[in-house]
Amino acid sequence: MAETSEEVAVLVQRVVKDITNAFRRNPHIDEIGLIPCPEARYNRSPIVLVENKLGVESWCVKFLLPYVHNKLLLYRTRKQWLNRDELIDVTCTLLLLNPDFTTAWNVRKELILSGTLNPIKDLHLGKLALTKFPKSPETWIHRRWVLQQLIQETSLPSFVTKGNLGTIPTERAQRLIQEEMEVCGEAAGRYPSNYNAWSHRIWVLQHLAKLDVKILLDELSSTKHWASMHVSDHSGFHYRQFLLKSLISQTVIDSSVMEQNPLRSEPALVPPKDEEAAVSTEEPRINLPHLLEEEVEFSTDLIDSYPGHETLWCHRRHIFYLQHHLNAGSQLSQAMEVDGLNDSSKQGYSQETKRLKRTPVPDSLGLEMEHRFIDQVLSTCRNVEQARFASAYRKWLVTLSQ
């Protein structure tokens, strides 16, 4: 075991080199982790590489982390010089152990801007860090910065024009979107209600996918099973609410464009060889009422199957809110603050009541069906929390219709 500063320096340099060599031997490493090992029992490297998994024996972290941390700070204060390769290796090791060290990410930003570091490699490093620290805010922030650099490259446009079909994601953009969705999904599975992961997923839809309708529909479909397996995950259900609201907003925008420019609805002349491609890229037609009805049925099944989960009742409020505005033909630019009335805050209650009264009166049929659903739940449930949430939902509906 190393004791003197010289021995620690030799040990750490060897470990950093072993980590670098591990990535060179296997560039497809997809997960990192700590191996519980209080002491160094054998005279061997504490870095273990098995297939695509990289492990670090825990005994060396107390030497490794302070050393690389101090080394980078000395570089930033111009008290010690590090060449580019050393910077890449030191920041890589540091971020795998502590991904919320902002200075290390900033150094790598400088390396990317100078052309020394491939931004794709930084996406991979961030993905690895998220397998151990799935909620790391600095990692998600840096990831968005890297993606912005990629989509801003003039030689790599994110979207291409397809005649009257508007713009669709390029193959490169589609690949990036798919990879980011996978990273977000893995992080959300590792940490419950991972707000940072779901927020990043929304950012990807807004900035990479440009709220493409087909991608929004695919996301709504692909996250349905996940939501049914994580019925207490507020962030996951908020994501579905974002998808539904975005689909409604995009449909409203498209309808308004069609009204202003009727020629847009005329079919474009497509060469025979491009007909198949045009069909495959044409935006699907959306039946919004049917889409929301399906979400109501999904909500009903979950509430019946998993009683006592507040997340499910909050989600149902949002669905009814969207149906309510869609049926009334109202714009969805208003804030969706429908998480309930806070009895302990009189001011909050007053503001919520005023906001709800500004909205159109909900259709009587939909409101009646919701009250029937609440009556059915209250008459059959034995769960105290379920009854409380159902009563709160009824109170919200009454306030909405006043």
UniProtKB/Swiss-Prot annotation:
Q: Any idea which UniProt keywords this protein has?
A: Acetylation, Prenyltransferase, Repeat, Transferase
Q: Does the keyword Acetylation apply?
A: yes
This protein's source sits in the domain of life called Eukaryota
Q: Where is this region: Disordered?
A: 263-282
Gene Ontology cellular component annotations, sorted alphabetically: cytoplasm; mitochondrion
Whether Flavoprotein counts among this entry's keywords is no
Per-repeat ranges for PFTA: 87-120, 122-155, 180-213, 219-252, 295-328
Q: Which residues carry this modification: N-acetylalanine?
A: A2
Query: What is the protein named?
Result: Protein prenyltransferase alpha subunit repeat-containing protein 1
Q: Name one GO molecular function term.
A: protein prenyltransferase activity
Q: Which InterPro entries match?
A: Prenyl_trans_a
**Similarity annotation:** Belongs to the protein prenyltransferase subunit alpha family.
